[in-house]
Amino acid sequence: VSGRKKIIEFKNVTFKYTRCQEPTLKNVSFDIYEGEKVLIAGSSGSGKSTISYCLNGLIPHMYEGEMSGEILIDGERPCEMKLHELSGKISTILQDQDAQFIGLTVKEDVAFVMENRNIPLKDMNLSVAEALEKVDMEAFQNSNPHEISGGQKQRVSLAGVLASKSGILLFDEPLANLDPASGENAMKLLSEIHKKYNKTVVIIEHRIEEVLSEKFDRVLVVSKGEIIANGTPQEILLSGVLVSAGLREPHYIRLMKLVGCNLNEYHNLDSPSVVKEASAQEKIHNFLARRVIKRESDEEREYALEVQNLTFSYGERLIFHDLNFSIKKGEIVTLLGANGVGKSTLSSVITGFLRHSRGEIKILGEDISNASIKKRGELIGYVMQNPNLMITKNSVFDEVAYGLKNKKVAKQEIVERVHQLLKICGLYGYRNWPISALSFGQKKRVTIASILVLNPMVLILDEPTAGQDYKHYLEFMGFISKISKMGIGILFITHDMHLALEYGDKSIVLYDTSIIAESTPTRVLMNCDIVKKASLREHSLSNISKLLNISSLELTERYLAEEGRQYE
């Protein structure tokens, strides 16, 4: 950064939201230089999103509170600037895209910033077309942005940023609603923009492995409102600070530790290719010689959910045709596939929000195809992808207790059950908080807790780990594993390949109206053809296997067995 201008400056910044007793940011200081690409990483509730609100003016213009210290954006104080002036310096993609859309069509939304700057129509149309082409959304330019899939919404938001001329690009969890392949492409695109236009890029994320697939100048680690580490990716990965901050280390780093590598001996830890070094190769080959103890499966378990010959269309558009799959009692199944393939639509059909044209849906052997939504709701718990669409109460406790109160459960039992769930979901300390003060990930856990407290027979969760950091992921999945052992069949609609490998008993891949794979997660996710078709992402263990010319199945099975699948 020698000779570069400071473009972002935080000087001893402390901030406390009006409704909170304790500050969310505590004496935060850091500088970001012009043209840098910086990752700000932290667990849910760490304060990383609050830093982004300070940068883009949402604090103090939208979120009120008490602030001390100084923030400078290109030498100016954002708190003294009008929002339209600040947006000329820094452009933001929010985590919740629905809260960001302005236009009635995708094209209008991307053009909005240029309309405000009086760009000539001819130039505007050209810029919009170029931006949509870069994110592969040209075919959706006349679509309603609120009616496309979550990943497509993310790409529209990205197109809007690309159409702006801001020098600083701020991304708040850009991978949250993208399928793995789209996420990988998005990170590559951000790198291209950074290099080609010398933009200052700041990314707020907790998905360390996925984000660090591209090069970064620096990583700032936030924990409990403080910056606990500030260094290069190499320095951060070597320090071990990610684990203490509640974040997941990249799998190849965990593998190297598992086989006994001394990380201090390696100088390119920010790339999986580090495993090609001779000492690492030798240790990994020795590791493969160890015996694997395989889990025993109970093939005699009763089916919790059966889907037979299921067909559904939106008008003349066929979404899926003759789907057949089942979930046994206590089985955890992950449904994988690209954005827009119909995963969330399938859950809506199963729960009765949409009616299928042909086929049967059975719960514990009973056909519920003609059952009401209320009847299905007694058997199936459904957690939506966007928590803001499910929240109806002001406080955390009241939201989780709402369903039990409707069922006339005794007051003391409600308190006991809600408190138990909140402790397991890592929310007990927030039980009396207003939900509006929570982070996106915390809101997600509130909605999940409000469903789990009702003890459904089948549980469907749409992107349950979106917005969840590694610490809360482990806590939540530990609880889900306990629920599965009680005999509840669980279906995860997810892009999280880590979840599928670490917790799934079976993975189903939906592609082009059909199921193209149904097997163990290892066999599905280590199959490169399936991964490519389903817009998934090659797992780092598969990449390592290619680098070392070893079996990806063998390496993954041994790795998972040695790490210990957390529900065992």
Positions of predicted regions on the chain:
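Helix-to-loop junction immediately C-terminal to a conserved catalytic motif
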Residues: 56, 351
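Conserved ABC transporter NBD signature motif
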Residues: 64-76, 359-367
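Conserved ABC ATPase "signature" region
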Residues: 122-140, 412-430
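Conserved beta-strand-loop-alpha-helix hinge in the C-terminal portion
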Residues: 226-252, 514-541
